[in-house]
Structure formats: structure tokens, C-alpha cells
């Protein structure tokens, strides 16, 4: 399993002539981006066709898909984005059958966790770091049970310090625990 930072290093490595052996793309591989608003980034929910800008949104999923489709045209990759703004891990699980398992991805990228923390701060959610880690671990075990050969890429949740939405005194260092938890799960899977 790769974290997003490792994926970025793999992309740079590939640009330098080295391809990461951790993610293997075959002809007709299906790649799925899953997560919250950072993944969603204004994608059109009514567009379910693979490889279209409308269903990719305007964020990292579009950038990654464009790069992969350009770099590997012979692979005829099928790339989807099913991020949903505001989602927490339990909400991913609620829609997992339709929005993940039905797609049968060969590579599954998940970026989730900001809302699991932020909604606690806002008083809208009674979660905790332990609930986040347990829910995500259970979801990953379930996914590997249903899709044993899926290659996982886990993105560390992040918050940009200094912006109007992030009060550093409220977010840090507690939010760093969510990142550490994700890293622990990435090492496990």
C-alpha cells in the first residue's frame, strides 16, 4: 500500500526513468479515487462514465487521471472518481457496495479523514481518533476480503495551516494523530 506522499515520489521517480514496482497497471486496469470533498472537487455526480473530466472533478483525481491516461495510452485504463464532499469513513462504508465494489477497481485510492476530525470540532459528530482508525481498518479489511487483489493507495488527511478555515490551536497537534493513524494502516495493508 502506498500513501499519497509515496505515490508522489513514485511519480517523480517515474519521470526520472524509474517506475515504482508497488502499483502494477495492466491493460484495462480500473482505477478508483474515493474519499471526501478533496477527492470530489466538484465532480458531476450524474456522470458515471470513466475517463471524463465531468466525473473527475477539478482536483488531484483529474490531475492523476490525466497523467496516467497520457503516460499509459496503451493500457486503456478506466478511471473513476466517487469522492463525496463532507463524507466521513462511516459514510464511505454506507455507499461502498455501489460506489466501490460494483466498480471492481484494480487500484483503489482513498483520501479520507478531514471531516472525521473537523466535524468533531464543529460539534456535528461524536467521533474520535479511535473510531476513525477502527472504521477505516474495518473498511480496508472488508475491501480486501471482497477484492483480494486490489492495490491500495491511502492518502494522508491534511489541513493547510494559516488559512481562514483552520485554527491551528484547535487543529494541531491533535489532527496529526489522524495522519499517524493512516500511516499505521498503510503499513498494515
Model-derived features with residue positions:
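N-terminal export leaders
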Residues: 1-3
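Serine-esterase "nucleophile elbow" of acetyl-processing enzymes
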Residues: 5-82, 97, 101-104
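Short, flexible loop segments at the rims of nucleotide/cofactor-binding pockets, characterized by
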Residues: 8-11, 84-89, 170-172
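Alpha-helical cap/lid subdomain in secreted, periplasmic
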Residues: 25, 58-59, 63-78, 91-189
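Residue-level detector of flexible, active-site-proximal loop/helix-junction positions
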Residues: 38, 86, 159
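Short beta->alpha connector loops of Rossmann-like oxidoreductase domains
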Residues: 41, 86, 116
